[in-house]
Each structure stands twice: as structure tokens, then as C-alpha cells.
Amino acid sequence: MIFNGSIVTSLDKKIKGQVLDFDYEKDFASVYNWLDQKFVDTKLSNLEETPL
């Protein structure tokens, strides 16, 4: 289960970073993407929890 502060990777590997906000009902997550150093909004279902 993904929470604020969780480290995640997108299924397409374009996002790797830390979750800042999420909503399971809306399938929404706001993530700080370490790969391009930007904040991105994506679908929560597109993310998987990842170890550092």
C-alpha cells in the first residue's frame, strides 16, 4: 500500500521518486520525480512501491 513518503516507480519506469499526496478514490498521486527533478501528477494505479 502506498502512503505519503513512499518511494515509488511507475510501471513504464519514467517516474521514480517520493509520493507527496495521493487519493485512492480518484486514482491520483502527486510524486516528486527524482529522474527529472520535477513534481508530477499521475495515476496511483500506475505506481509500484520500490525499495531505495
Model-predicted regions and their roles:
Residues 1-52:
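Basic/aromatic-rich interaction segments and small domains that mediate binding to polyanionic partners
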